């Protein structure tokens, strides 16, 4: 989840994803096997959606691609308070740069340079992705 800009991570490290057993003959999907370009093609639209819905304060839309473990871990009251009171979380710029991808286990971490429309400077965005029930889901997201 996007932190309120004080270097504090609201949604922590990803918990191991519950894995649905693949159908007989189907291989298990593992996002780390994708190329950087394939990962960015998935991650960047998800990051842009997080930025958009954070700016609009639409928590339901913001959380729609969260893994079940991340969705359970986030208190909607705290998230609502963050959206209402964080100048950074409500004023994120569309201007981003991807900085790199880290692969670990069954997750990838995509790093972005994020800017604000109201605050000078740059922030580090972190988006953790993996598969859950055959779909790419967000297992962690933060800005610091």
Regions found by a protein language model. Give the residues of each.
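Short, low-complexity N-terminal intrinsically disordered segments enriched in polar/charged residues
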Residues: 2-56
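Generic detector of low-complexity/intrinsically disordered segments
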Residues: 3-4, 94, 129
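Arginine residue identity/basic-tract feature
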Residues: 8, 19, 28, 48, ...
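Short, charge-rich amphipathic segments
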Residues: 13-20, 57-63, 90-94, 116-122
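Short secondary-structure boundary micro-motifs
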Residues: 34-38, 83-86, 97-99, 110-114, ...
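Conserved short hydrophobic patches within well-ordered secondary structure
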Residues: 42, 79-80, 127, 141
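Short solvent-exposed beta->alpha transition segments
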Residues: 44-45, 49-55, 59-107
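Exposed beta-sheet edge and beta->alpha loop/turn motif
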Residues: 100-144
């Amino acid at each position: 989840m996007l932190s309120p800009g004080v270097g504090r991570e609201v949604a922590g490290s990803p918990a191991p994803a519950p894995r649905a057993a693949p159908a007989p003959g189907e291989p298990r999907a593992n996002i780390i096997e994708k190329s950087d370009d394939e990962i960015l093609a998935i991650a960047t639209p998800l990051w842009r959606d997080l930025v958009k819905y954070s700016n609009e304060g639409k928590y339901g839309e913001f959380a729609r691609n969260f893994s079940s473990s991340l969705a359970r871990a986030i208190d909607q009251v705290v998230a609502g308070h963050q959206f209402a009171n964080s100048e950074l979380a409500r004023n994120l710029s569309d201007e981003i740069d991807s900085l790199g991808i880290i692969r670990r286990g069954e997750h990838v971490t995509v790093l972005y340079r994020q800017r604000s429309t109201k605050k000078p400077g740059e922030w580090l965005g972190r988006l953790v992705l993996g598969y859950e029930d055959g779909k790419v889901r967000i297992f962690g997201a933060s800005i610091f």
